[in-house]
Amino acid sequence: MKLGKKALEALQAEIDGRLMPGDELIVAGPVAAEGTAWITKNYHDRLREFFAERFLEDAVKLPEVYGTGTENDKIWKMAEESGASARYRMGEGGFLAALWKMAEASGVGLSADLRSVPIRQETIEICEILDVNPYKLLSGGSILMGIHGGDAFVQQLRREGIMAAVIGQTDSGN
């Protein structure tokens, strides 16, 4: 699907920079933490049939405990200083929407390994019970970036206590 000029411009305005072929894709912060908290609150009674109350309480706190919301500005600046070609603060539509938006806005193709995406076990288990795709859940607090030398940047983020991983790479196709 090709976007019209105005739609493409609006999409590009959401993203800082543009992905370049050969960029490594990095996710900082566990995806779907915000969405997990929301569905846990809204489906609490159903989830109590499967999980202990303590587990559900912890799931509600995921964004504040593991999310990057309070560190977003720090991560944003670190990415800029490390030469990131593009940065995007995830939100509605989750991780998969973020991937599509960045690729479409940048005119590149990409490959991603879902097994590498930082995600909490609580999210996986709750989504499995509710038959929800965790990669489409609200992911506020997580950041998707494109950068050359992604492994070094991920190590830098991890030293700061931030959950992060190289999850894929861009190419010239789209």
What are these regions (language model features)?
Residues 1-174:
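Helix-biased detector of long, well-ordered alpha-helical tracts
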